[in-house]
Regions:
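Amphipathic terminal alpha-helices
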Residues: 285-302
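Conserved catalytic-site region of short-chain dehydrogenase/reductase
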Residues: 74, 110-124, 136-142, 167-174
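Conserved Rossmann-fold NAD(P)-dependent oxidoreductase catalytic core, especially the SDR/UDP-sugar
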Residues: 65, 93-134
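Glycine/proline-rich active-site loop of Rossmann-fold NAD(P)-dependent oxidoreductases
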Residues: 142, 157-158, 167-179, 188-189, ...
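NAD(P)H-binding glycine-rich loop region in Rossmannoid oxidoreductase-like domains
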Residues: 50-87
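N-terminal Rossmann NAD(P)H-binding glycine-rich loop of SDR-like oxidoreductase domains
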Residues: 4-24
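Conserved beta-loop-beta element that borders a ligand/cofactor-binding pocket
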Residues: 113, 145-170
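C-terminal "lid/loop" region of Rossmann-like NAD(P)-dependent oxidoreductases
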Residues: 195, 223-226, 234-241, 248-266, ...
Length: 302
């Protein structure tokens, strides 16, 4: 059994990854997060604002540690930059320092973000594109990537970072699709930020998990970075229309014409490196949004 630790195992990506790895049979999966879990023996409770990972690694030898923890809000990072820095950067350093001391053979996979790119000059966005974050969140994710490289270069730890683009899917109660769904309940008139022509490279959480597993098993751990997306550019207007159609909403959608601070204009990833590891998209944006609406209705959230 491959002993694997998922940090942030109760979060959006972490919880789906934990379930998938646990179901495969070859992994002995342990979790760690800020909430208590009285039903699981393979679980560590941590205080994210004052984390101490040394006790975890002092008593356990893991083959893999996957860091899915941290804050994932651009607006919140602008309001509370120190908190965001601690959750997204300092905790990565503390994790790697604990691994360096007690479990130096452990491979560390860090979940990063496409926010490190900001507004790219060239589309497609390769992993070698210029890194110009537009927010503290993006800057802190980039600093965490640099820390992963630091521990590889100077302490010979095996690390890599995964830059996830626009994630969505069941259990996500924030960001654009959640906001649209909640607004659809309240009114037949809806206003969204931007012009609608802004674009994203959306990826369903099931495909995110599949991509992480491809990197986990076949990726390089020399401080490498991987884009995790589908290399399909979808405008916000088209994505919103698809979701509202699945919701059965009939009303008037308008856009403010103004971007929120920290939001990029257009994203489309080059996923050549990821596809070389065997990744192929399984869930289209249309299928994924229908599944998201099904979940919203099952949970009586719309």
């Amino acid at each position: 059994m491959i002993k694997t630790l998922v940090i942030g195992s109760k979060g959006f990506i972490g919880s789906h990854l934990f379930k998938s790895l646990s179901a495969q049979g070859e992994f002995e999966v342990w979790g760690s997060d800020v909430v208590y879990d009285y039903t699981s023996h393979n679980y560590f409770v941590i205080d994210a604002s004052n984390s101490d990972f040394e006790e975890i690694f002092e008593g356990n030898q893991f083959e893999f540690c996957i860091n899915c923890s941290g804050s994932a809000s651009v607006p919140d990072s602008l309001i509370h930059p120190l908190r965001d820095f601690y959750l997204n950067t300092v905790n990565v350093f503390k994790l790697l320092e604990a691994i360096r001391k007690y479990s130096p053979k452990c491979k560390f996979l860090n979940i990063s973000s496409a926010a490190v790119y900001g507004n790219p000059v060239v589309m497609l966005i390769t992993e070698n594109a210029a890194l110009r974050p537009l927010s503290p969140y993006g800057q802190h994710k980039l600093q965490a990537e640099n820390i992963c490289m630091e521990f590889h270069m100077f302490h010979q730890l095996k690390t890599c970072s995964v830059r996830i683009f626009s994630a969505y899917g069941r259990d996500l109660k924030k960001q654009v699709f959640w906001d649209i769904a909640q607004k659809s309940i309240k009114s037949k008139k809806m206003t969204l930020f931007g012009t609608g022509e802004e674009s994203r490279d959306f990826i369903h959480v099931d495909d995110i998990v599949y991509g992480i597993e491809c990197i986990l098993k076949k990726g390089e751990y020399d401080g490498a970075v991987y884009n995790l997306a589908n290399s399909i550019e979808v405008t916000i207007a088209d994505a919103a229309a698809e979701l509202l159609n699945s919701l059965g909403w009939q009303g008037k959608l308008t856009f403010t014409g103004q971007l929120r601070k920290g939001d990029p204009l257009k994203w489309r990833a080059d996923i050549t490196r990821l596809k070389a590891l065997g990744y192929e998209q399984k869930i289209s944006i249309s299928e994924g949004l229908k599944d998201y609406v099904k979940w919203l209705k099952e949970e009586k959230l719309v």
